[in-house]
Amino acid sequence: MNVTILGAGVVGVTSAWYLAKAGHKVTVIDRQPAAALETSFANAGEVSPGYSSPWAAPGIPMKAMKWLFMKHAPLIIRPTADPAAWRWMSQMLRNCTSARYAINKSRMVRVAEYSRDCLMALREETGIDYDQRMQGTLEVFRTQKQFDAIGKDVDVLTAGGVPFEILDRDGCAAIEPGLAPAKEKIVGGLRLPGDETGDCFMFTTELARMAEEAGVTFLYDTGIMRPIVEGGRIKAVETTRGLIEADIFVAALGSYSPQFVRQLGLTLPVYPVKGYSITVPIVKEERAPVSTVMDETFKVAITRLGSRIRAGGMAEIAGFSKDLPAARQETLAHSVEDLFGGAGDQSQAKFWCGLRPMTPDGTPVIGATRYSNLYLNTGHGTLGWTMSCGSARVLADLISGNKPEIDTHDLAISRYAA
């Protein structure tokens, strides 16, 4: 079949790869001049199935109130008159119960664990290089209260068969020697040895090149305007290059997916949650992280990417704004310098932001819609890199009429109709 994918981020490009491998003729459309130039460009670099957790969690409403008064707050809510923002936040609050958290986290871990397996297989098949490291991730806790609260996560990890280690501060410093001078600032950590790290932009651009060699057509610098419906199906998509027809269409437009499907009468509860990153060159090897260290207090992930350190995180609900406030850069730099002082050259920091497409329950939306030839692959939030290969493989199986290797009944948009 002829399949047209809307969006050339990591989710769109991996979808193109697996669909092409399944024998379909694939076209990818994106408004940018190349792949991975928006949310996939400079994310935190984690491939972390075990840390796949919804932001909607017990205690978050109270924490959000406290964060309002923090200098380096991990969550910022900008005043907005956008009803979609308030509707999304209301739905998110309804997911902040222990019962909903357990359900949502189990869904997310299911997709993320499968995705890591798919990434491993793809790496073995292609030899793709993206500054990857397979040395696990470490979440560090600065307070005893944070450390004591990991029980609910440990329960889900245990139930899912995900290996983990609970470490004291000395154990954290043994895993990440660069933490040793700052170890008194933490009380302990949770390590997931099966997690990986890597540069999402490098991966996506290289996979796009491989996909093109495999016959995928990429139409860059092409604006996507509206779907054309005929007989209950999407006949074509109107673009700045004219009408593009296909047998199947896949919306992998990240935070812009709701705008596209709204024209079809579909309500997709995906909203942009802005995240930030800084990237600095390593100047002191002995102080640099080995892999990824997640700072629970500031919700910042500090990752080694080759000869660079990438610090990414925070969450800002500010619509589609892409401004870069100096205060956000200060927070990222503070987290890096506080734990890995002097490891990177902050004077050469490259500051970036991206709009993560978040669902209120944290789980991505993958699968069919009420239009027989329209599929969705979006809403991955902070985990687009982690979940991309698995989500794409699931999508390719669904479109090809094959049974996916994991349960997908609760991943489609239909779960919001209940």
Curated annotation (Swiss-Prot):
EC number of this enzyme: 1.4.99.-
Top EC category: oxidoreductase
Keyword field contains Flavoprotein: yes
Positions that bind FAD: 3-17
Listed GO MF terms: D-amino-acid dehydrogenase activity
Name of the gene: dadA
Reaction(s) catalysed by this chain's protein: a D-alpha-amino acid + A + H2O = a 2-oxocarboxylate + AH2 + NH4(+)
Entry-linked InterPro entries: DadA (IPR023080), FAD-dep_OxRdtase (IPR006076), FAD/NAD-bd_sf (IPR036188)
Keyword list, A-Z: FAD, Flavoprotein, Oxidoreductase
Metabolic or biological pathway: Amino-acid degradation; D-alanine degradation; NH(3) and pyruvate from D-alanine: step 1/1
Species this chain originates from: Agrobacterium fabrum (strain C58 / ATCC 33970)
NCBIfam families found in the cross-reference section: PRK00711.1
Gene3D superfamilies the UniProt entry points to: D-Amino Acid Oxidase, subunit A, domain 2, FAD/NAD(P)-binding domain
Protein name as annotated: D-amino acid dehydrogenase
Family: Belongs to the DadA oxidoreductase family.
